Amino acid sequence: NYYKKLFGSGTTLVVT
C-alpha cells in the first residue's frame, strides 16, 4: 500500500 500526493489538485491517491 502506498500514498501518492497528487500535486496541483491537492488530493491524495490511495493505492492499496
UniProtKB/Swiss-Prot annotation:
GO BP, sorted A to Z: adaptive immune response
Source species taxonomy: Eukaryota, Metazoa, Chordata, Craniata, Vertebrata
KW Cell membrane (keyword) present: yes
Record has Transport as a keyword: no
Subcellular location: Cell membrane
GO terms for cellular component: T cell receptor complex
Function summary: J region of the variable domain of T cell receptor (TR) gamma chain that participates in the antigen recognition. Gamma-delta TRs recognize a variety of self and foreign non-peptide antigens frequently expressed at the epithelial boundaries between the host and external environment, including endogenous lipids presented by MH-like protein CD1D and phosphoantigens presented by butyrophilin-like molecule BTN3A1. Upon antigen recognition induces rapid, innate-like immune responses involved in pathogen clearance and tissue repair.
Assembly: Gamma-delta TR is a heterodimer composed of a gamma and delta chain; disulfide-linked. The gamma-delta TR is associated with the transmembrane signaling CD3 coreceptor proteins following the stoichiometry: a single gamma-delta TR heterodimer associates with one CD3D-CD3E heterodimer, one CD3G-CD3E heterodimer and one CD247 homodimer forming a stable octameric structure. Upon activation, gamma-delta TR complex associates with FCER1G to initiate intracellular signaling.
UniProt superkingdom: Eukaryota
Species this chain originates from: Homo sapiens
Keywords: Adaptive immunity, Cell membrane, Immunity, Membrane, Receptor, T cell receptor
The name this protein goes by in its record: T cell receptor gamma joining 1
